[in-house]
Amino acid sequence: MTGVGTFWRTVRHLKPAQVLARLRFRLHKPRPDLRPAPARQALIGPWVQPAARDASLVGPGRLLFLNLERDLNACGWDDPQIEKLWRYNLHYFDDLNAVGSAERAGIQRVLLDRWLRDNPPASGTGWEPYPVSLRIVNWVKWLLGGAPARDAWRHSLAVQARWLSLRLEWHLLGNHLFVNAKALVFAGLYFQGTEAQQWLQTGLAIIDRQLAEQVLADGAQFERSPMYHALALEDLLDLLNIGQALAPAGSVVLTLLPNWRETAGRMLFWLRCMAHPDGGIGFFNDAAHGIAPSNAEIERYAAQLGVRALVPMQEGITPLMASGYVRVARGPAVALLDTAPIGPDYLPGHAHADTLSFELSLGIQRVVVNGGTSCYGLSAQRLLERGTAAHNTVQVAGQDSSEVWSGFRVGRRARPGKLLVDGWAVSCSHDGYRHLPGAPVHSRRWQFEDGGLLVQDVVAPSVAKTVARYHFAPGLTVRATGAGAWSVMAGDKPLAHVTVQTGQASLMPSRHAPQFGVVQSAQCLVVNLTDGRATTHWRWGTHAHSLSV
């Protein structure tokens, strides 16, 4: 059971408006408005093919979400025994715009008609605001892409938009409120008339305020998850797309397009900075492959919409000061460093206790990776994946650097100190263990050099049972080559050599979750700090060879 202290440390960061909105959301139960749908707006400009995901409708009535396939005849639309996130995905209709969608048009129409029959307005998970928002957008995209529009589908779209306009998630804010607003903009542009204009005005007003708050100066989405950042960028690109396609002359939407395009460019730069050379996102906070479109697909979509962005330096250090991340590229190495706060104080639901963690690639091979995310909800696995031990950083006295609990809650939060960049050295500290006796502070310094990286950790004052962890990517083999020395191999190819210069180290089994529903075996180097200090030296290329012979 959660203690009073943890609960207070969690709720005291909420905005008063969130608390009031939650009460209003629970108490106010509007009735669905079943009036006929407004007329449809004709296309004015070109409609660009949106970013596509992998297919999720894998056969008639067979759906694949989160790497788990089910038959709709067996599971139904809202089985409470099935994970909530899987049920949410069931109601999104992402497959309408997925890879190879046209080949499944027949079974897609059957599924859509079945949804209308089995999910009456305002009933069940499918009518919660978040799935309603994503479904409105997906249906409109599909129809704008040329799918024949049936009257029943258009009518349901209008009913959903009316319902959503009364169920906006002001109590959650963040990405939920943004996609609520995006859906209203989509409905407001797809339909004509006074009612549609009201949806449009409501959506645009929210987006105007939230875009300024949620996109930081360096382009990061403020929850600081590369996965949710990619989703937010997709949202903004979708708004650009429908604005160009449906906004009539004189519409206020046309005046917003330049700002949306500039903001999307900054967001694309941040996404590029937080990607590994293999093209995929880094695993910071809640992050997994297969939820957002691939970075390559987002790049394609952005280019077709005329979005331009800077390219990260091929050689050098790129501090993303507003969000708190650092990209380092030197020789074959690319490192992503986390010196960031865990997220907005009032919205830390997707945060992990990963402060001062990092990831490392050599060429297109990931070498050091954080633990990833395989699940949401309330489970020991969820807590494990959010905890400090699943990340490449220091854990003090068995505690988490930020007090993660439940599925999406955080009590005490680590606060990073000043980020310092000196030549090829990056250093920072945090106070996430300030509640322990002596209020210990963890400081970390990354010193990059030709063919190597020196990681120095200090915890002062020193505390017993303090360890640094380095989680190796699945598929790599790590073997001891001497006292305090290990060789890292990809198959029979040597990648790197690791020497623990200060501290007592051992190799332990580990787990990595690159996608929801996927957990892979891996290895982890665990370094026990000596007198509050650990120094770990990583070498690669010819430098690694000279150390390992």
Each PLM stretch: what is its role?
Residues 81-84, 316, 324, 454-455:
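Beta-sandwich/jelly-roll carbohydrate-recognition scaffolds of carbohydrate-active enzymes
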Residues 84-264:
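Aromatic-lined, polymer-binding surfaces characteristic
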Residues 220-369, 420, 522:
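Carbohydrate-active enzyme catalytic cores, enriched for enzymes
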Residues 1-4, 10-11, 23, 78, ...:
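CBM-like, beta-strand-rich accessory domains located in the C-terminal region of large
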Residues 1-73:
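Extreme N-terminal leader/anchor segments
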Residues 10, 22, 34, 313-396, ...:
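Beta-strand-rich N-terminal accessory domains
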Residues 175-177, 228-229, 350-352, 370, ...:
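Histidine-centered active-site/metal-ligand motif
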Residues 32-52, 66-98, 173-191:
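Long, acidic, intrinsically disordered low-complexity segments
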